[in-house]
Amino acid sequence: MPCSRRTFFLALAVAGPHAGAAPAVQRPQHSSVPGGVALIPLGSANERPVAQQAQLPLLVVGGPAAWTALVGIPLAAPAGTARIEVQAAGALPRSVGFEVWPKKYLEQRLRVAPGQVDLSPADQARYERERAHQRQVMATLSPPLDADTLAMAPPVPGRRSGSFGLRRTFNGQARAPHSGMDIAAPTGTPVRAPLAARVIDTGDYFFNGRTVWLDHGGGLLTLYCHLSEIEVRTGDLLRAGERLGAVGATGRATGPHLHWGVLLNRTMVDPALFLAAGA
């Protein structure tokens, strides 16, 4: 069965008989449901194994005594057995299975300006261009960071006004499920990077408004939308806690808030799974 939904982190010790073993790495909560993250133990190996699912590289963390693959599970994934492919140096390729459990998300009904639901031809063309660009950004894959934690602090203080996975209707019309966490806060509230990162995209988009994408390495990206101000540029390197912008209500928004998204192996997953204990 899926684990408890409490927010906690698994710190898997990798110290052992291997000389020079890395310290424990804090990982996100294991939640093997659509929109969740599955933590798949890969065992020991002197070098980091390569893991893939549907030919997409997966983030592998840990050290020689214990490696773990982090698998982002799409919201549309069916319940049942899923598999990843693993290749360790000096070993035969192997397939590792894990169970995906069903999860039903709540519904959210919103009212926005009609032009933000029934797009004009010009706005539709703009959206299509922006969507193609965003897909390129989401395909970013850089080497995994040598970090001892993936635990994130909330990027902004405030009330969680919208949770991940909500089945949304705008003006009575069904649209895509909510792909992030909404945090309500006053306009101008600083937004900070939850982990060390490189800025890989900034822009002002039709639905997302003023937006920043951060790359944390290994296919782990984070997204910040509806900003009133963007305070970074593409290519900037940020430390955890550095400002990247300020809360706003740009794009399709019903009020000032931050839409915070987490992308893992090109899949939007629940940001709450990455929050440090007590956050």
Where are these regions (language model features)?
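Conserved, short, structured surface segments that act as functional micro-motifs
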Residues: 211-216, 236-279
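Short, well-structured beta-strand-loop connectors
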Residues: 190-200, 231-247
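Extracytoplasmic
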Residues: 35-37, 64-66, 79, 93-95, ...
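Surface-exposed, glycine-biased beta-strand/turn segments
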Residues: 97-208
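N-terminal signal peptide c-region/cleavage motif recognized by signal peptidases
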Residues: 16-19
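N-terminal secretory signal peptides and thylakoid transit peptides that target proteins
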Residues: 1-14
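Cationic-aromatic interfacial patches
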Residues: 22-96
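Zn2+-dependent peptidoglycan hydrolase active-site motif and core
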Residues: 194-228, 256, 261
